[in-house]
């Protein structure tokens, strides 16, 4: 940018996103108002599938995602002396995890789900009173991603009833879908083709 500053006009902002992995950084940056006066926004990701020396601009349908923490609350009891008095939060969470991994795929596009952590229990002879599940869902569109969130919610409700426990769900982060602006794609492609050593990949990589 500095090498070409006398050829440029207007204002250019360079932003680096914190907390990308939990998809919290971009939301906070947008809420701060720092991009409110931007006419165009160019984003890049080091994990994209273009090779060195290539630029890919015709992107669409990056998977939306929602990160959720679900906590099941049961009732502790001695597993040997009085198990009937307990409500097993770990058993509820484990059952929910199995059901979540069996959610039917969506006919309109890709879906993903992963239960990455399940933390529970106080001791080997104690009915677990609390279980924390950390999971994520993904969908090709916002609607498909919401379908996955709804399915997870329905499973948690049913499991809570079946196991006599309660639960709470917290949204820890989310990312919406992406549709590139064709006018800007054309400008970037033309600039890329005019730059020695750069190959333009003019097709979706998804």
Regions of interest found by a model, annotated:
Residues 1:
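Active-site alpha-helical elements of protease catalytic centers
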Residues 6-117, 122-126:
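Histidine/acidic-residue-rich, glycine-tolerant segments that coordinate divalent metal ions
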């Amino acid at each position: 940018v500095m090498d070409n500053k006398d050829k440029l006009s207007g204002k250019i902002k360079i932003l680096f996103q914190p907390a990308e992995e939990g998809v919290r950084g971009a939301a906070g940056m947008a809420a701060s108002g720092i991009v409110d006066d931007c006419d165009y926004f160019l984003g890049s990701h080091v994990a994209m599938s273009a090779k060195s020396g290539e630029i890919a601009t015709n992107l669409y349908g990056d998977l939306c995602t929602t990160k959720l923490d679900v906590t099941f609350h049961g009732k502790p009891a001695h597993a040997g002396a009085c198990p009937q008095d307990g409500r097993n939060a770990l058993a509820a969470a484990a059952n929910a995890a199995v059901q979540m991994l069996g959610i039917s795929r969506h006919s309109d596009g890709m879906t993903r789900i992963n239960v990455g952590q399940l933390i529970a229990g106080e001791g080997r002879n104690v009915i677990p009173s609390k279980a924390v599940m950390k999971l994520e869902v993904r969908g090709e569109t916002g609607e498909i991603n919401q379908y996955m969130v709804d399915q997870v919610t329905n499973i948690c409700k049913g499991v809570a009833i079946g196991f006599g426990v309660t639960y709470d769900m917290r949204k820890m982060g989310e990312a919406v879908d992406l549709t590139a602006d064709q006018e800007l794609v054309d400008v970037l492609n033309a600039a890329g083709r005019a730059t020695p050593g750069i190959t333009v990949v003019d097709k979706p990589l998804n």
